[in-house]
Amino acid sequence: MIKRYEACFLFKSEEIEYKGSLEEVKKSLEFFGATDVVSNFIGERALEYPIKKQARGRYEIIEFSMEGNNLKEFESRLKLIRNLLRYMILVKIVRKINTKKIKRRNFREFRDNIDKDSLKGASKVETPTGPESTDIQEK
């Protein structure tokens, strides 16, 4: 059965190593019959802790469709790529969104979050008192 996957890859930060490793990943995807491959470069960031003696890394997210039984072989191929520091592959669940429920829920949240005290206070009109409120400039 063909499923939709989303994979996040962390590569070494050097430009040449990154491009070479990314091409290896894409060739592996083609080899294992992945379709609808969409690549998205996230950026280069500092890592919280060193991974394989690297302090920075480049993130890439790739979405693809593939047979479920090819995924294990694909993961074993990923482990052989030297400049790939980490990867994570998730099954992307596509759900039909019911907009009526969302609209109802948003309205309920809005209704429940209204500060009733501020509404009561806003309806009152303060009448000015004191001599400065009744003074009108005369010519």
UniProtKB/Swiss-Prot annotation:
Swiss-Prot/TrEMBL keywords: Ribonucleoprotein, Ribosomal protein, RNA-binding, rRNA-binding
One Pfam family per UniProt: Ribosomal_S6
GO CC annotations on file: ribonucleoprotein complex; ribosome
GO MF term set: rRNA binding; structural constituent of ribosome
Polar residues: compositionally biased ranges: 130-139
Residue ranges, annotated region (Disordered): 120-139
Taxonomic superkingdom: Bacteria
A single GO BP: translation
Functional summary from the UniProt entry: Binds together with bS18 to 16S ribosomal RNA.
Recorded family membership: Belongs to the bacterial ribosomal protein bS6 family.
Alphabetized HAMAP family for the sequence: Ribosomal_bS6
Name of the protein in its database record: Small ribosomal subunit protein bS6
